[in-house]
């Protein structure tokens, strides 16, 4: 069975033609500030790919608001703010964090009267101490390493319109959850949830994170390219962030570079690649939009799920 049977496929030029605006709302300096370390994104990417996507999301959001209003009227209930939730999924190092941050900024520029918030699910990993207690430290990043009950409670509280909801944050420099530095979400109109696991279907819960999504995006690339970007990022970090003595990977930056890369390649082989193949990639066709990348993070195709 063709896995793309439920999708319309567009090349870059065709996708751009749906909203051919030359207004980017951003400068290249803005993009450089939000992109991940080795990601590549340009103003042309914004014009060709992201502005049409943002316009589509705006249309979906307006329809969502209208439907919520009609539903509340039909049920004779007082209206309340129910946030529109967008999920961003994809492998490590594929550029999903850049996509999430870019969508947040563009939505703020397009709808300045709306509160646009973003979280990452990294904060819902179990702390290292708990992973060690459970004997799954080597499985960090796999589905069982996430506190799904806590994540689902967070999503439910946001969806219920709680005045403020807190989410744990994660520090890549210390390689652990930062329980004492929570992120507070204040009744967003739109919430972007970014993470490798947001479209997964865990076997131990009846409710899934994706059940809360009104729209979802999967950032896609061939595994060989993702590995290349992963190792490129690791090399850049060896020369920058890893030079900080407080960084988790500081010993690798001070030791033999070949040994450091040997370790990184082993982590990719033992953790990230199996996680991609077994748990992340199978969720791709659950997304509403798939952004397909080629060399240099160039998006050459966009897949849009048919209604």
UniProtKB/Swiss-Prot annotation:
Keywords from the named record: ATP-binding, Coenzyme A biosynthesis, Cytoplasm, Kinase, Nucleotide-binding, Transferase
Catalytic activity: (R)-pantothenate + ATP = (R)-4'-phosphopantothenate + ADP + H(+)
Protein localization: Cytoplasm
EC class name: transferase
GO molecular function, a single term: ATP binding
Entry's Gene Ontology cellular component terms: cytoplasm
Record-linked InterPro entries: P-loop_NTPase, PanK, PRK/URK
Family: Belongs to the prokaryotic pantothenate kinase family.
Residues annotated to bind ATP: 90-97
CDD domains in the record: PanK
Pfam family, one: PRK
Protein name, entry field: Pantothenate kinase
PANTHER family the record matches: URIDINE KINASE (PTHR10285)
EC number(s) on file: 2.7.1.33
Pathway: Cofactor biosynthesis; coenzyme A biosynthesis; CoA from (R)-pantothenate: step 1/5
A GO BP entry: coenzyme A biosynthetic process
């Amino acid at each position: 069975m063709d896995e793309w049977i439920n999708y319309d496929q567009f090349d870059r030029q065709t996708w751009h033609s749906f909203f051919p605006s030359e207004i980017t709302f951003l400068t290249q300096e803005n993009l450089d500030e939000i992109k991940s370390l080795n990601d590549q994104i340009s103003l042309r990417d914004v014009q060709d790919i992201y502005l049409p996507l943002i316009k589509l999301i705006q249309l979906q959001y307006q329809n969502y608001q209208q439907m919520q209003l009609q539903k509340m009227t039909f049920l004779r209930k007082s209206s309340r703010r129910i946030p529109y939730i967008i999920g961003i999924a994809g492998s490590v190092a594929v550029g999903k964090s850049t996509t999430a941050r870019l969508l947040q900024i563009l939505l703020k520029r397009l709808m300045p009267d709306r509160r646009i918030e973003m979280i990452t699910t990294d904060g819902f990993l179990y702390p290292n101490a708990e992973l060690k207690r459970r004997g799954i430290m080597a499985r960090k990043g796999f589905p069982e390493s996430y506190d799904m009950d806590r994540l689902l409670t967070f999503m439910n509280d946001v969806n219920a319109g709680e005045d403020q909801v807190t989410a744990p944050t994660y520090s890549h420099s210390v390689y652990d959850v930062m329980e004492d530095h929570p992120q507070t979400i204040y009744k967003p109109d739109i919430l972007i949830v970014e993470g490798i696991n947001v479209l997964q279907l865990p076997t131990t819960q009846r409710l899934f994170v994706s059940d809360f999504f009104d729209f979802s995006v999967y950032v896609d690339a061939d595994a060989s390219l993702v590995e290349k970007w992963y190792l490129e990022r690791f090399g850049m970090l060896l020369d920058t962030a890893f030079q900080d003595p407080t960084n988790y990977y500081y010993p690798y930056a001070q030791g033999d570079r070949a040994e450091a890369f040997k370790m990184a390649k082993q982590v990719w082989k033992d953790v990230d690649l199996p996680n991609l193949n077994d748990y992340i990639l199978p969720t791709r066709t659950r997304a509403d939009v798939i952004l397909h990348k080629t060399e240099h993070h160039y998006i050459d195709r966009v897949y849009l799920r048919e209604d």
